[in-house]
Design a protein with these regions (language model features):
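Conserved Walker A/P-loop ATP-binding site and its immediately adjacent core
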Residues: 1-31, 49-52, 208-212, 270-277
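Conserved coupling segment at the C-terminus of the helicase ATP-binding
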Residues: 63-69, 74-265, 274-280, 394, ...
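Conserved motor-coupling elements within RecA-like helicase/translocase cores
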Residues: 31-44, 279, 286-309, 314-315, ...
């Protein structure tokens, strides 16, 4: 029969062909080859060849090729490519994007006028706006007409045929530079040769979470896995989190230490973006991204020492033996699409929002160990990534073998002195990369009796979301889809994820009862303030007053956690409080988090309700801080517009809070001087560059002070320490805010 071997990219196509020749296996890269058609050769192609809107494997009006057997190698690495093929992304300069924008501009403006104006101006700092699901369902014919008009445009001709007839089951998202249309799930059955194959085989070394295989390839969650009996085949890895053991260790400290090791070993660093790659410029010029990754891998494999940086390349490459003795995962993988970034925003604070990122991290770890006898040290760095893995217990999302290897390395570190300097931590790494006999024995014994799981690890929510999509798209059974979603929502405990799932429920309810869909969306706001507002908006205000005395609040939040976890979270927050371009969202989120970590009620009204201040703190005794963040400002004076925003936020506070509540208006801006056209109120307080730096410095000192044995768990001692560093309400306003100046 017809057999196809499918890989993520052309680099691997060539690799498979070479290996097939060595093994004496006949292969071809053309579906027209007679040897393929008569079944004597295996067709080797990349994933884009199989899945595209003009695919000869099911999307042609005639002459489609059938497949009896399909094997997809490194299937987890193919997931993103398949998603891309089944979605449309058009730059805003394209006529298609302009027409789609004109169709929905009123809907976007009604959601968030500031974001709308930023997107209109092409401001790279702008957020993302998604067309309300009810409007997309109402206007699917108009949207279809636009896409049909441009169906031969190079930007959409390979994508549009796959989703053009299911636009009512799609999300449409706008950014400062593009519009993206993506279905709720992948209609994989469009590629008939794949859907109708007698055998479909999926190969992957990543077994920590198989949910995407269900959502993308529609794999039955009950299929059996064929895997090695034991996990000892993955080789020897020591996984270390230096900043989790000693939060005072900085990224710079780790970089300097790795540069030393690069004199003797190949050190490979995987970063999420080109921007983060710049951090490594002072220790290496060997930085490789998608455009030169093939040459980069060849260079790395030909060397035995040096430091190399790979940009956003967590899968699809092999660096065996001496080509990689230390692999470094620096930072959280970036979201791939606008919709993924929007989903991240919806799921802020929920562990469910980061599972796919954890899977990418594990894929990255695997680049440096390619056989049973191979070995490699793994360094996890970057405060935000360490905080997610360590504090949020996301390590539990790793595969069983990776969890075991992480546990063994952690046990080794516990044997060190309590100081755990960076030198001591890296001396632990030496056990692995120098193959200390005792360590090798420990490592092998740990995995010798550890078996792989025989069933797919698929989240129930993923299965239900897939079934709801199939019932609606394939059968038109919206009632059944809605029933599945309601049952899932009722079973979900995580409030943020529950609210997100209610948004998905409302999308299917819209087909059955639009009024109920709006009610569901309004109810979802009670669980998750990040999701879109219903048609009539939301008028409730978060009750921040349900907090205890400051030190007690901190103690209760971390009752079952240790001080290192608190310090890690605090480091993540204050590290992001910087005056810099394109950073206001991270700044506002971090300032909100700082308030929570200081034991205060903290929220982001403007982000939640599209009205009110950037950040609102409740500091006790009916007193609030109303804060506007202008950390991206570069002007020497504070503009009239900035001033009016803070005045407007104070007005919002007075209109929405009881008269016995008071607020302190605070402006965060590099300057303290208002423009002569501005009219600041007398009680305005300022946090400028000097004040912000003083605050961050004293927060770090506070963290060092509470790391002393016994302080963090002692409410009285913790309260005294807050007072010492002026981190109580009165101390904060007196020490870290200042008067403003006014231009005469």
């Amino acid at each position: 029969g017809h057999a196809a071997y499918v890989v993520p990219d052309n680099y691997l196509v060539n690799q498979v062909i070479e290996e097939a020749k060595d093994l004496g296996i006949d292969v071809t890269t053309s579906e027209k080859d007679v040897s393929f058609l008569d079944g004597s050769s295996i067709l080797v192609i990349n994933i884009q060849k199989l899945f595209n809107g003009l695919s000869i494997f099911g999307m042609r009006s005639w002459g489609n090729v059938t497949l009896d057997y399909v094997l997809i190698d490194d299937v987890h690495a193919c997931v993103d490519d398949v998603k891309t093929q089944f979605s449309i992304r058009v730059d805003n300069e394209n006529a298609i994007a302009k027409e789609i924008f004109n169709l929905y501009k009123d809907d976007l403006k009604a959601q968030n006028e500031k974001n709308f104006l930023d997107i209109c101006s092409g401001d790279p700092k702008s957020g993302y706006l998604s067309v309300p699901f009810w409007r997309l369902q109402e206007t699917k014919s108009e949207l279809l007409a636009i896409l049909q008009k441009y169906k031969n445009d190079p930007g959409i001709k390979f994508n549009y045929p796959l989703i053009g007839d299911i636009l009512q089951f799609c999300n449409c998202t706008f950014t400062h530079n593009s519009v993206e249309i993506e279905p709720y799930a992948i209609p994989i059955s469009k590629i008939m040769a794949f859907a109708n194959a007698q055998r479909r085989i999926f190969m992957s070394a990543t077994l920590c979470d198989d949910s995407q295989l269900t959502s993308v390839f529609d794999i039955d969650e009950n299929i059996e896995i064929i895997s090695p009996k034991l996990a000892a085949d993955i080789g020897d890895r020591m996984i270390l989190f230096p900043q989790a053991y000693t939060p005072q260790i900085t990224d710079q400290d780790i970089k300097n230490k790795l540069a030393e090791y690069a004199n003797d070993y190949n050190v490979v660093v995987i970063v999420p973006s080109k921007n983060r790659a710049n951090f490594w410029n002072d220790v290496t010029s060997e930085i490789y991204s998608a455009i030169n990754i093939v040459d980069g891998v060849k260079k790395i494999r030909s060397q035995k020492h040096g430091l190399y940086v790979l940009v956003n390349k967590y899968d699809g490459i092999d660096l065996p033996n001496d080509s990689c003795r230390i692999i470094v995962l620096d930072g959280i993988p970036d979201a791939r699409t606008a919709l993924e970034r929007l989903r991240e925003n919806y799921l802020q604070g929920s562990i469910n929002g980061i599972k796919e990122k954890i899977q990418k991290i594990e894929q990255g770890m695997g680049r440096g160990v390619r056989s049973t006898n191979d070995y490699c040290g793994v360094i996890i760095m970057g405060a935000a990534l360490v905080q997610i893995l360590y504090s949020q217990k996301a390590v539990s999302f790793f595969s069983v073998a990776t969890r075991k290897q992480y546990g063994d390395a952690s046990q080794m570190n516990k044997k060190l002195d309590t100081a755990k300097s960076i030198d001591e931590i890296f001396s632990t790494l030496d056990y692995c990369i120098k193959q200390d006999k005792n360590w090798v024995q420990i490592s092998r014994n740990a995995l010798s009796n550890l078996g792989y799981e025989k069933e797919l690890k698929v989240e129930k929510a993923t299965v239900v979301l897939r079934k709801a999509f199939d019932y609606s798209m394939l059968k038109g059974n919206y009632v059944k889809a809605l029933e599945l979603m309601r049952n899932l929502v009722n079973e979900t405990k995580d409030p943020i994820y529950k609210g997100f799932l209610m948004l998905e429920e409302a999308k299917y309810c819209q087909f059955v009862n639009p009024t109920d869909a709006q009610r569901i969306l309004a109810a979802a706001q009670e669980y998750n303030h990040h999701i879109p507002n219903p048609i009539d908006g939301i008028k409730t205000i978060d009750d921040l007053k349900k907090i205890k005395a400051q030190a007690q609040q901190i103690a209760d939040m971390y009752a079952d956690k240790d001080v290192n976890e608190y310090i890690l979270n605090m480091n993540v927050a204050i590290d992001s409080l910087v005056f810099a371009p394109s950073s206001y969202r991270v700044f506002e989120k971090s300032l909100m988090q700082l308030g929570k970590l200081l034991g205060w009620g903290s929220s982001r009204p403007d982000e939640m309700y599209n009205i009110g201040p950037d950040v609102l703190w409740y500091v006790g005794n009916l007193k609030y801080a109303v804060i506007e963040c202008k950390n991206e400002a570069t002007s020497e004076k504070i503009s009239k517009d900035n001033c009016e925003q803070l005045l407007s936020s104070v007005s919002w506070f007075k209109n929405n809070f009881p008269s016995d509540c008071s607020c302190i208006p605070i402006m965060i801006h590099p300057s303290v001087k208002f423009d002569k056209h501005a009219s600041p109120a007398e009680d305005f307080r300022m946090i400028d560059t000097a004040m912000l730096n003083r605050l961050k410095e004293n927060v770090r000192k506070f963290c060092i002070a509470i790391s002393v044995s016994g302080v963090f768990k002692n409410v009285s001692a913790l309260s005294d320490t807050l007072d010492t560093f002026n981190l109580t309400p009165n101390g904060f306003f007196k020490s870290y805010t200042t008067d403003y100046l006014y231009e005469i």
